[in-house]
């Protein structure tokens, strides 16, 4: 195993005061939520205000802190400047549709056309979330993302909305006058087509601006969370490749749930598992040592739940964990 070139902590994230967006992502069940909550706690010590957002429909933030969060930013108990919110992208789009002024035939037809394009509903709900978040003026925003696969989908959203705008524009210019006439004859409101265009256009502008920020390493970074097993490491490598292709900065990997059996321990299961973990940990070092901070966290005997346990756990992100000696 080559010598570690970069400190095995996330202190670099706390030191980089220009960061605005921090994503924590990886395979399901590797401890993303615990990591993102712990990182947010550490950031709250050095930044003016921190917002922690979960876009995972499983809503693990409430479980982690033992406090109910909703789609509105709520102050986390025990902190003055840490806020959390849980968003379900699918319900966000539903609410938006209900709130939008879609009376009359034109409005509903335009909506149907827009949503017939794959990914438009997700893109629009993401834009709504971003519009909301941007208006809130937090110093830094930490995303606890859904498991890998969904994580990077938002990067294709500007293209998706461009497509929706193009399609609506073509259909609107062909059939718009006729449908508007029919709509007004049936008592519908005029201008629904323009409303729909305006909504899509403003959302596209928001997503394009946000994506530009996501590609700026001064403003955005992605923390990959994994465990020391083949599938998780494979998934992490895929994630790193994808992030690189999308030009999103990533230079921190958190390896969770590591076993450190005592020499005197005669637990066969523990030593076999420890050996396997060390093998994949060596591979991780080989792959990432040069450009990544690799943070090693232990498998604990109890769950990390509640503000106090999370505060305690968060210290291991900035001070390397030392396994107890025999």
From Swiss-Prot:
HAMAP family: Asna1_Get3. It holds the Pfam family ArsA_ATPase. One of its GO terms (biological process) is tail-anchored membrane protein insertion into ER membrane. GO terms for cellular component: GET complex. This is ATPase GET3. It is found in: Cytoplasm; Endoplasmic reticulum. It comes from the Eukaryota. SUPFAM superfamilies: P-loop containing nucleoside triphosphate hydrolases. Its EC number is 3.6.-.-. The keyword Nuclease does not apply. GO terms for molecular function: ATP binding; ATP hydrolysis activity; metal ion binding. ATP binds at residues 27-34, 229, 256. Zn(2+) binds at residues 267, 270. Belongs to the arsA ATPase family. The active site is at 56. Homodimer. ATPase required for the post-translational delivery of tail-anchored (TA) proteins to the endoplasmic reticulum. Recognizes and selectively binds the transmembrane domain of TA proteins in the cytosol. This complex then targets to the endoplasmic reticulum by membrane-bound receptors, where the tail-anchored protein is released for insertion. This process is regulated by ATP binding and hydrolysis. ATP binding drives the homodimer towards the closed dimer state, facilitating recognition of newly synthesized TA membrane proteins. ATP hydrolysis is required for insertion. Keywords: ATP-binding, Cytoplasm, Endoplasmic reticulum, Hydrolase, Metal-binding, Nucleotide-binding, Transport, Zinc.
